[in-house]
């Protein structure tokens, strides 16, 4: 995933997007909050929490309540749970268990039964062991642009019958719509 550096700085106010805020904050100025009626919206989990059944469910509800810049509810779909290696086993339990994780009850696991999240992305280069994120299908969210298209070259050596190949390219990444990533720093 090309966006690991953006996720490592997701809560850092020194790295801002088009609305002047970090990628994940509780006060994006570019949208109206449907629930609070004020001039800000959030893609930060209300209360920082470790990855658990309850916190994941809260995040998924928050994603479904997202609004566009005019304050109208939009239908965002959660696509991928993004975690550091320390959370990969917990993430697998939460996404694949048929019943609610860690309980003796016979309750269904709604994340699994409703098919709310497809898969887990485990990023070994995340600097926080506790932060976790949910990527959505927001249009124009996390973006990759070509800085230099792929260039290929080949060179042969007549004396040794060796051939050398070379391929280079340059990409730039960033985000346009903060609704493409929701997250929490964890605990």
PLM regions and their residue ranges:
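Generic macromolecular interface patches on structured domains
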Residues: 6-9, 101
